[in-house]
């Protein structure tokens, strides 16, 4: 009987929502990241230097935007709205990559959208931590299970990404990623 009571306490709706959203956002991200260099070289026609430059600009912008949004989130404290905003940016980013093949557009608008979108996952983990602290859950276990969801997503996502990209095209792959982010918004 005690086992049933503790199991029911562990499997509440909020807990399940955190796990599902972490998994889905992880899959959507894992669809895009591993195939990016292939997309840039094959679809956009970028030479190796430009692919490397894209990754460099993307990393620097991601760090700067993430730091800025983290400071803003810590001071204002509304992580839910920020996560929703970041997921909306992720949808826009995936659709941009699905239907645009112009390098300058991708390295400007795409990098900006990706930088904003990539902030969603750390904010989700911060919100989960706040939830675990306030609900008397075991914080370490809760965080570990969420990280396991993200790891599982990264086991499933890359092979799925290459299967979709090589068999159905990058437009389909990025559109599916956008769809997964839309579902994560709900």
Where would I find each of the regions flagged by the language model?
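Helix-loop boundary and gating motifs at the non-cytosolic
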Residues: 3-59
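Hydrophobic core of transmembrane alpha-helices in multi-pass small-molecule transporters
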Residues: 23, 93, 103-121
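Residue-level signature of mid-helix packing/kink "hotspots" within the transmembrane helices
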Residues: 59-67, 154-155
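Helix-to-loop junctions at the C-terminal end of transmembrane segments
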Residues: 64-78, 165
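Structural signature of the two symmetry-related core transmembrane helices
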Residues: 81-96, 175-178
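Cytoplasmic helix-loop-helix junction between adjacent transmembrane helices
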Residues: 111-148
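Transmembrane alpha-helix termini and helix-breaking/packing motifs in multi-pass membrane transporters
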Residues: 156-172
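Symmetry-related core transmembrane helices of the 12-TM Major Facilitator Superfamily/SLC fold
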Residues: 172-186
